[in-house]
Regions:
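Acidic, contiguous internal or C-terminal segments within carbohydrate-active enzymes
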Residues: 21-23, 34, 119-160, 164-166
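Extended, loop-rich substrate-binding clefts of extracytoplasmic carbohydrate-active enzymes
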Residues: 1-13, 84-140
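A short, structured loop/turn motif at beta-sheet edges
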Residues: 106-113, 138-143, 170-173, 248-252, ...
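Beta-strand-rich interaction surfaces with strong enrichment in secreted/lumenal proteins
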Residues: 134-136, 211, 271-276
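Beta-strand-rich N-terminal accessory domains
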Residues: 1-69, 73-82, 89-92, 218-241, ...
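Active-site/ligand-binding surface loops and adjacent short beta/alpha elements
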Residues: 157-159, 166-238
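Active-site pocket scaffolds in enzymes
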Residues: 231-293
């Protein structure tokens, strides 16, 4: 049976409450930090950490570039850095704003930890809609289970996209081998997308500080194995996700393998985003499985 405990950590003078779900039989633990974007900030197997943390970014006010950020109401950076609703342009952060907000603890129990984020006057300055987000985290052996429910609390249809940006520990990029099946693979989501090669790889060009692969028609699960540290990570997702992103930057010891629901400008493009009618809700589910090989 899982155990759920709380702990407090201090980063650069800031104190954060964390919820830790532990499966003693599987020797796994999942750490969630509600105040830091309501996200996963740790996932260990037999004491070995699989989620990468960038310090001092943990305690900074800017966008988290570590852990498992929740992306809402968009993924990536929209054209011009704005969303256009009813003829008006609204500024939008890269990957939306959910990862910048402190989330409230909705419930803690046998079904895991559920956090809530509700619209405020500040979020409506960026995104003129009333909403509630509920994210649930649970642990099943060596698998973290994550669900996101989006609720339209307003009086008009609500457009959005969503996704996640997990940072996984990696010994070195050249040690990481991917097992992914998808329809297309490119470095830019604009225009016609080239067919994916039989083998998906992530390599950095000479002189580049980062590397990216944008995938469509992903046949989940996506998996990578790191021959340097013996980690195997599997990301599985339901039918609400059909896109994936692989990313790595600055030769840091991480690799991102991300499930996305939309592209950077999807919310501005007709037919390329989700729309919830008044009082409607939508739930998506995905998981992270960690293994030692």
């Amino acid at each position: 049976m899982n155990q759920i405990t709380t702990q407090y950590i201090t980063e650069n003078g800031a104190c954060y409450e964390q919820y830790v779900i532990t499966d003693p039989a599987a020797k796994t633990s999942l750490t969630i930090t509600p105040e830091r974007g309501g996200m996963i900030t740790g996932f260990t197997l037999d004491g070995d950490e699989y989620i990468w943390t960038r310090r001092p970014n943990f305690s900074e006010c800017n966008r988290p570039r570590f852990g498992v950020p929740v992306l809402f109401p968009s993924c990536g950076n929209p054209d011009g850095g704005v969303h256009n609703f009813e003829g008006k342009a609204y500024p939008m952060e890269t990957h939306g704003f959910a990862d910048l907000c402190a989330w409230d603890v909705e419930s803690v129990g046998p079904d895991g930890v559920t956090l809530a984020l509700e619209s405020t006057p500040l979020t409506k300055f960026l995104y003129p809609f009333d909403f509630t987000l509920l994210v649930n985290y649970n642990l099943e052996g060596n698998k973290a289970l994550i669900s996101l429910t989006v609720i339209n609390e307003g009086d008009k249809p609500m457009p959005f996209s969503f996704g996640y940006h997990p940072y996984f520990v990696a010994s070195a990029l050249e040690n990481v081998d991917f097992d992914i099946k998808c329809a297309t693979c490119s470095e830019n989501a604009k225009g016609e997308q080239p067919a994916a090669p039989e083998k998906i790889t992530l390599t950095r060009k000479a002189g580049a500080d980062n590397t990216i692969r944008l995938l469509t028609g992903v046949q989940f699960p996506m998996t990578f194995t790191d021959k340097g540290n013996g980690h195997k990570v599997t990301v599985d997702a339901d039918e609400t996700f059909d896109k994936g992103v692989l990313w790595q930057q600055d030769a840091e010891n991480f690799v991102c393998m991300e499930p996305w629901n939309g592209w950077a400008n999807s919310v501005n493009e007709e037919g390329r985003h989700e729309v919830l009618d008044v009082d409607e809700a939508m739930t998506s589910e995905w998981s992270i499985t960690i293994e030692k090989v």
